[in-house]
Amino acid sequence: MKRIIRIIAYALAACLFLVIVAIAWVVVLLNSGPKPGTVVDEARRAGRESSSFVAAEEDYFHDMDGGVALTPGEVRGRNTWLVWTGGNDRFWDVLTRYAFGSFDLLKVLSSHPGLKYSRDDRWSYFGLVNEPCFEKPTGGDPDRFGLWFDKRRADCGPDPFEDESKYPGVAIGARGKTVPRGSYYGYASGVLGLRLFPNPDFDEAAAKKWDARRYYEDPTYYLARDLVRPYRVGMSCAFCHVGPSPVSPPADAENPKWENLSNTVGSQYFWIDRIFNWPADERNFIFQLLHTSRPGSLDPSLISTDYINNPRAMNAVYGLADRLAAAKSWNSKEILAGGALNNKQLNDYFRDGPLTQFFQAPDTVWTAHVLKDGADSAGALAALNRVYINIGLFSEEWLLHFNPLVGGKPITPILITDLRRNSPYWNATEAQAPDMAQFLVKASTPHRLKTAPGGGAYLTESDAVRERGKEVFADQCARCHSSKAPTPPAGANPAACAGSGYLACWSRYWEWTKTEAFREQMRQIVRAPDFLEQNYLSNDMRIPVTLLQTNACSPLATNAIAGNIWDNFSSQSYKDLPSVGEITYYDPYTGEPHQYQMPAGGVGYTRVPSLISIWSSAPFLLNNTVGPFDPSPSVDARMGVFNASIEQLLWPEKRARDPLLGDKVPGLIDRTTSTSYLRVPAGYWVADVPDWLRAALRRTMPNSFDGDDLRIGPIPAGTPIDLLSNLRILPEGEDFTAAAKHSAKLAGLLFDLANALRRLPADATDADASKAIRPLVPRLIELSKCPDFVVNRGHYFGTGQAGDGPGLSDADKRALIALLKTF
């Protein structure tokens, strides 16, 4: 019996350690019940129809975006972008329980003196934009259940979107009883992109148990799964896309004015590790994992996990009209099939005008490739609408298709037909998307350095230097980073042959761009005085990662492949993309190179980013790993980061190197910065585990307890984070025999890993823990979904390391930089 108990304890510890089956009892508790396609959202439960969610028309944000003049429809689109959350406050409340309380947006919004942060330093600490017209609270607000939320200034008028008579909230549960009904736009929170909603679960019983002091000060209270908070927090598009204007930066980043803010520049400064793990405790491995996201980046598959940690820089939205026009001029067509045919297209809303040219019935769309891997490929509106699902709209349905954060359950596609049938929130979002698209077309104009305060001081190079920069750009960069280009020969336009033949077309295109004929034509185009006008500064094509040599984890993302969560939002052309071949990866402990065969079916590519306003968007690469970070949004700070980042890009020897392996690997490996553990607070597990099993766990793994909290580890400092985070928990796309072999290998690995950790003494050092784990590294790599650990490598064009001839001279690199600053 004792041996049986010990084996059970080992297995449970292994599962907890990798946060996979994570406390399977909690996952089952939260996920048991209905099947996909059988549930409705809160709006439908309350008897609301999509037509009752009318888009707000008040031009409250008129000073944003450089004061651009908008039509009434564009005003509605901007309001939707900024304040419409589509009922996703339910999702962010549920996620607090899945994350064991370490994620809590109400804490992020608070200025309680016991926290590490407040409104006074919210920008510098979180990188979140303080909404104008608010100030720091001096105490708990009795009108808001004692919570320390920002207070609206007396000299400001009311927020028009809070008007519940004009925009009546969804009356379910306790709303209208123990809490107000509220508006369907919620209340302003003091942070742009986050709105407060009365919690319909905050009934009389919850109100009696509520204690604001304990919520801020007592972990046994606020780290309990059954805690019901009086508010839920909804998230709009603005959370990830609003930031300080590069050409009108605030004098004080903690207190911006509306005229200092842009809706399209992107949240380039937010710290997702601190936002999604408010204690920011580096002893927690989850914080270590989130910390791999540099400021201004996040993993878009963090929730619907694909077992790949792939932080991506937040997209700026520039030149949308030019981007769409480029899709047409390059004949960048995608063929839709299956559920992707159900997406709304611009033609469904516009009967004439330029926005009608991007779809041809029954199945052809000319579109931008929005996600970094080019997976958003079913039309501009499909890309806009999908994002709302990814931030929690109709979470009742979405969460039935996977286990959030931890995985361990086969992912199935969320179907547009189910969304339309069961979610008024979804239908309202679809109806408002065309106005959003029109707003983004109008507002996504470039931010030029020459128009920024003091920008001229950074544009002092001679005309001759910039002219040389144009030649260098034409020869080295424009084949990818210009939407204006010579017409490719027949069979050499990759954009026109997306699908199984794409890579062959790409190879022909790439060879053509090396010819003198191409370069001479391209030089003429770049020298033209109108080169920057209506130029997206990208051809928006998908580039094979074998050519880029960048980290492979982003292009390996699988959320949009056939049968996965975003199946209905990617084209058949994307799903039919061929394998790009083999990449080289490096053992994170020895530096030894190995080969990895990239799969087919959509993965393996990265779409070309635009260079519009590149002076303002450093650090570089798809994960913000090339260049330093400066929290100041001033022109001087942006230029300081740009200069350092562009030097690292063009002189790769200046990039950060791995402290353990140095030059044995081509860059930096993200490693844990301190000894860490996977932690599960007592309030999230004790009540669900029988006393006998808790006692057995204590006997066999005494070092895994911190009081009643579970503490699985230790994970030593210096551990490659992606060695653990990228472990492929479930077999995918394999026959039964291969899947069984994978599962057997995984079970054996987890058992041995748990056993190795169990044997460590209570006073084990990092060296002891590393010694215990090291023998298992080859097996961890074998079962990794992405074994590429070097995060800042690649994009060596013009440096001599791209395999295309000698690099540029230092003078030519300086000339190129002089030109880039004018973009």
Describe the residue ranges of each PLM region:
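Periplasmic c-type cytochrome electron-transfer domains
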Residues: 4-15, 19-823
